[in-house]
Amino acid sequence: MKLALIFLAAAAPAAVLPSSTFQHYVEEFHRDYPDHLYGAIPDSEAFDWMKANIPVLSCPDRELERVYYYRWWAYRKHIESTPHGFVLTEFLRPVKHSTDYNAISCALGLHVAEGRWLRDRRYLEDYLSFWLTGGENGGLERHYHQFSNWTASAVWDRWLADGDTKSLVARLDSLIADYRAWESERLTPNGLFWQRDVSDGMESSISGGRRVKNLRPTINTYMWANAKAIAAIAALAGRDDVRREYEAKASNLRQLFQKLHWNPKDQFFETLLEDGKFAGVREEIGYTPWAFDLPEQRNGYGEAWKQLTDPKGFYAPYGPTTAEQRHPEFVIARKGDDCQWNGPSWPFATSITLRAAANVLDDYAPPQFLTPEIYRDLLGIYTKSQHLKLPDGSVAPFVDENLDPFTGIWLARDLKITKHTYYGRGDHYNHSSYADLIITGLIGLRPRADNTIEVKPLANWDWFCLDAVPYHGHLLTILWDKTGQHFHRGQGLRVFADDREVAHSDRLARVSAAL
């Protein structure tokens, strides 16, 4: 069906990059994957939908560019039309642990991170309403808390990109209800939250279990980020009592988190067992706090980042690994549960770690263990990981559930093939982010609460362009041309808002400008 489109900008400015920039990729994806699995937008309309919706990227790294467009092509497949509006799915095929319309809340925050860069805002509006007001009497959807989430923080981050205050403030009471529900379900007497690893979407972890009630860096980071976001939204709504209440919650959680989750012996944020002792393993979830700017710039927390490039820590050819490789329980299992978090590389975790790394490089005084070069290496590994060897021997962009971090084989997929239970469950799995990492990390558009454009690239190419980016009701173009001979728009870094140049630098460096 043809879909009418709703745009933030009143009129689209002239494009620097034509749609032919990516049309051949779309045609390639159709040839590679002729299964015609999709939701509301059929493959026959994929190019038109992408042309009308996505930021257009051109850069010298053709494989990164190819994966960027593949991820948008795949994201589109997961937009499902229901009698109550649009939802996003994780799996294209039905799974038993989903709720209505095959929806699952586990990767909700990542769905919002990606979708905030679409020009049609209805998808996320409907999707958020489904989870926050789709339950009994307009309450939370009944399976929403099946998994931990950072929804309030994701809604705030969406506002940082689109600037739609009316939509944001309208969510406040639902987000408060969400937070209070988590408090009633998971808050412990010491002020932190507990969670089972499977309800973090991270089953078979070294530190957790399906029945144990451990204090995990994940849910406690999410709850801090949610409290902080609710306080900020309340301030915009003029509800000072709510603002003060949630500022106090956030302040208390941050101090407790840093005091209790930091293991000074391992120099890492770690899980606490029910008996109050550390689980005694560094896991990739220890980087989650930086994805939300939780750790303060003190106490040597930056030491944790040395593990990311250590082959005995998390570094691997198709990593990072989800647990440190030096631990005796680290394993890449060929038996048991298909989905294990005791070693395999998960795009879900990699997405959060790369967001965390970009935040450290932008918002902190970065430790020596994390540099733009290291960030680009890790992003390159993530890009390389998202591929599949097809029956004809060619290699195409692809994303599934988890990877063997040493071979790059999609592990759950391979195990199911071995067991003769494979049915394509994880094909084009919508459980991670990529476009948002390119836009906010590599290209460096850093969304802000004020009416300011800030760009701080982590790329080191001689040229790139990100075009038609919706931001605060405008369409942005971020263009870097070292010599001025590639795009013929002048030399240097230039930022345009609706075709009007608003910022310029001769070097590839931070720029900012008022809209």
Region locations from a protein language model:
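Sec-dependent signal peptide recognition
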Residues: M1-F7
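Hydrophobic h-region of N-terminal signal peptides that target proteins for export
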Residues: F7-A15
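Acidic/polar, glycine-enriched structural segments that form the non-catalytic walls/loops
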Residues: A14-D100, L160, T165-S167, L172, ...
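The feature captures the catalytic groove of carbohydrate-active enzymes
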Residues: F22-Y38, E45, N137-N149, T165, ...
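Active-site acid/base region of carbohydrate-active enzymes
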Residues: C59-Y70, E80, Y101, S105-L108, ...
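Alpha-helical support elements that line or immediately flank enzyme active sites
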Residues: V95-L128, E284-Q297, T350-D363, P372-E373, ...
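Short glycine/serine- and small hydrophobic-enriched flexible loop segments
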Residues: A113-R116, S153-L160, A225-L236, A291-L294, ...
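Non-catalytic carbohydrate-binding regions of carbohydrate-active enzymes
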Residues: A237-L273, G302-L475
